[in-house]
């Protein structure tokens, strides 16, 4: 319902304008120009608003939108996020280190990324008799599934800061509509001791969440509790569990898949001006999976 939430925000804005400028009230969709603007998830939200019928919306500007459609090479965020979380740490070892952005500092991460290559080879996901061949195999798999070189380079930060796993953990709960303590892979959020064990958050920590936290742990004193954490590849088992929901069987997977399907976008209503701005180097929401397919679907539906 992201699109309807945008519409509700516009209705609230009209009401707020009426209270702030009573001498010019009433403000309505008929006498007020409404342009919906958003980036990332907000970009996806304003594109979903563009689907809604009625003359309430005058134009849409979407930046780097998290949006997916039927066909045209589109992939849902959960799909490519879980893929990247598994493969990208290994694949980046096949790319010249000088071409990759820092921070994060790459040298301390390399042992973990090398362990990922070993794990993926043992699981039959990639091929290669040595580390170089395994990294090349992971790199080729990502390119074959639609990742551009620019997106892979930009994705270095997401791999290095463990953002792919953070997004996947959170979105698995959201798409599957799982409550607190019911994550199907056993993940949880908590303040943590130095040994990563969970502990209650302090009052000061809780007080900072609203102003400082991004909403997606880890960060600001909230960590990810992963019951499957184990050496030598610490996060592999948990990531394999999350990846299994993309196309796998079982009730938990079906719930996640149903949630993803419910977020699929449709073309904008006819005649509505829509501007989509998306950088080719976006490594978090690659345009090849989001904006480009959306525009192709819109044009196929007769939108200009």
PLM feature spans:
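C-terminal His-loop and adjacent cap/lid subdomain of alpha/beta-hydrolase
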Residues: 1-304
